[in-house]
């Protein structure tokens, strides 16, 4: 029985091929402890030679299934998106890992744009893609005949192509369970490469929060007329890491953005919480925008949908004029560059 050790540094997790055990820590593209710049975590993990698949949680599966069921409108041309599943990788690979989305245009404009930015920044690395949602992968394959690697397939591809130095950069919003799953799965391959480093998620340090605050306030500045409430919808989680939404709210308020509100679909602050907070003001208009990397099912339906229960209809029923901005954070150049910075820290850690 082999035991492996995986050291995870949130500033830039450097993984070396040594003997001992796996890893742990966080939740999907939904929540994170405001992690320390540098933290090592280890966990014992048995391996039998076969690579294991990380199952989706019930919530993740439900989200992916809901997205896969949305066939009432065109989500864009899948052929315009680069699945980045080619061989001929070379010795250096930068694997960008995302939950994924079956919304073709959003996938290209968010995840694809992040991958493009990373590719431009690291010409000595071949950039490849891995999704964590098998349901989305299967749906895109069935509907559009586009093959996207899951994380295990992407790691297998890297190993078969003789990659020696592997950097994994997640596009997760926060350090949560899905980030932990990624670290654990990468641990199973720690003896397949000379060096492995895992970059940190979007919201990890104080500087990250400030950078995201700056990005989202700048992109909504045209609506900030003093008469409009600007509300961001995150995913949310019941895990402790859900506190990052409160942290983002506090940072917005402290910076003087008192008409900016942060809520979630799955946890607190809820839609009711955000609506109640907005009603304490004297606003006539409301702008809704997702606080998510992609604009998928949650953004198009839970936020901007016309059916009862959506954020849009709830605010309209309360008498507000509502504008929905169905854009993922990944479309913003500032967010793309923040992921590049995180990837740079991971790349730099390979030589330490």
What do these predicted regions represent?
Residues 1-10:
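Bacterial Sec-dependent N-terminal signal peptides
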Residues 13-14:
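Repetitive helical segments and hydrophobic/amphipathic motifs
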Residues 33:
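Pyridoxal 5′-phosphate
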Residues 18-22:
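C-terminal motif of bacterial Sec signal peptides marking the signal peptidase cleavage site
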Residues 1, 41, 49-52:
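Glycine-centered signal
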Residues 25, 29-30, 48-352:
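Active-site-proximal alpha-helix that buttresses catalytic centers in soluble enzyme cores
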